[in-house]
Structures are given as structure tokens and as C-alpha cells.
């Protein structure tokens, strides 16, 4: 599912008419661009933490007016991402449905699912299933000392560290603004 959505995030702006998606700037966990009258299409001033003057950034956008597949793609992005144009890629003159950080999250999740699909086994517990991607010989000591849960939590935490550092540094320091290559 994540890989399919990731592909749709690239296909939607590529296959839509050029310049049909303007520069967006919404709020995470909110629907900002469903209709012409939605919050994101209003003018909220420049330089604020959320929103901008949409009329100065290409005009209004309503994903509900798109074909159903593109509407689903942009609608899911609208609900889950802030869609700030300066943090998003543009394809064919159209802003992508989610920011570069979310593209990285979907890519990492898709790669993890692929690795598990090729190497993992469905075992009795989540931690055993999670650790099944590693060769059994390298896991012998972990099982003998029953260190499965701490190892699983450590690996998961290690995977979240880059995202956490980037997100919290940006939140806590006004002088730091993450850029697309870092995301």
C-alpha cells in the first residue's frame, strides 16, 4: 500500500496538466484544500507558521475536483502533510501531494516492507517476526539471552533518530530550517 501511494505521489503531478497544482501551504492533520472555500485557499498572510496568501502563490486548488485517483492521492496528502511548497518537490509544474520528508518516510517504509517480504518470516510474536530478517546464526546469542525485545526497540529507535533530530531541531531552533536533501 505504501509503495503504491509513493508511486502515485510521483505519477499524479506528472500526468496532471502542467501548472494545475499551485504552491500549497497547509496544516498537518487537517483538510486544507478539498474545496475552493477550504482553509488553504484563503489568504493567511505571508511569513506565518501555517498558511500563506494563496492568491499570491498560483491561486486556489481543490483536490475534490480532480479525477478520483488523483483526488485520493492529494486528499491523503492534504490530511497527513503540511504541504509547504518550499519543502516539497515540483513535477511538471505541479507541487507533489506530500513534502520531501514524507516521501522519505514512504520510501523507507516501502523498502523495509520489501526486505521483510524477501527475508522475513511470520513468527509467533511481533519481535520474532521483526528480527527474522537477520540470519539465524547472528541471532543465536540474542535468543539465548532473551534480548529480542531490547534489540527490536533499539533498531526501531535507531531508524527514528534521523527523523527525530531533523524534526525536533527545526521545532526548537528558530534559526534552523531543514532542507530537501537532508529530509
PLM region descriptions:
Residues 1-19:
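Hydrophobic secretory-pathway targeting helix
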Residues 4-9, 79, 108-112, 145-174:
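Small-polar-interrupted transmembrane alpha-helices in polytopic inner-membrane proteins
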Residues 16-23, 87-97, 164-183:
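Interfacial helix-loop-helix junctions of multi-pass membrane proteins
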Residues 17-96:
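Extracytosolic (periplasmic/ER-lumenal) interhelical loops and adjacent juxtamembrane/interface segments
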Residues 95-110, 183:
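Membrane-interface loop-to-helix entry segments
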Residues 103-123:
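Membrane-interfacial alpha-helical segments at the cytosolic side of multi-pass membrane proteins
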Residues 123-149:
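Membrane-interfacial, low-structure loops and terminal tails that flank and connect transmembrane helices
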Amino acid at each position: 500500500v505504501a509503495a503504491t501511494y509513493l508511486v502515485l505521489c510521483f505519477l499524479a503531478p506528472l500526468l496532471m496538466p502542467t501548472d494545475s497544482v499551485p504552491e500549497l501551504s497547509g496544516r498537518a492533520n487537517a483538510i486544507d484544500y478539498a474545496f475552493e472555500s477550504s482553509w488553504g485557499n484563503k489568504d493567511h498572510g505571508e511569513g506565518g507558521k501555517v498558511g500563506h496568501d494563496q492568491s499570491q502563490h498560483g491561486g486556489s486548488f481543490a483536490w475534490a475536483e480532480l479525477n478520483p485517483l488523483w483526488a485520493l492521492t492529494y486528499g491523503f496528502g492534504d490530511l497527513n502533510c503540511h504541504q509547504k511548497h518550499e519543502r516539497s518537490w515540483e513535477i511538471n509544474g505541479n507541487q507533489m501531494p506530500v513534502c520531501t520528508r514524507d516521501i522519505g518516510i514512504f520510501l523507507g517504509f516501502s523498502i523495509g516492507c520489501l526486505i521483510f517480504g524477501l527475508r522475513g518470516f511470520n513468527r509467533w510474536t511481533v519481535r520474532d517476526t521483526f528480527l527474522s530478517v537477520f540470519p539465524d546464526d547472528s541471532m543465536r546469542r540474542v535468543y539465548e539471552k532473551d534480548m529480542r525485545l531490547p534489540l527490536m526497540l533499539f533498531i526501531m529507535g535507531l531508524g527514528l533518530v534521523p527523523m527525530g533530530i531533523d524534526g525536533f531541531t527545526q521545532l526548537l531552533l528558530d534559526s534552523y530550517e531543514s532542507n530537501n536533501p537532508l529530509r
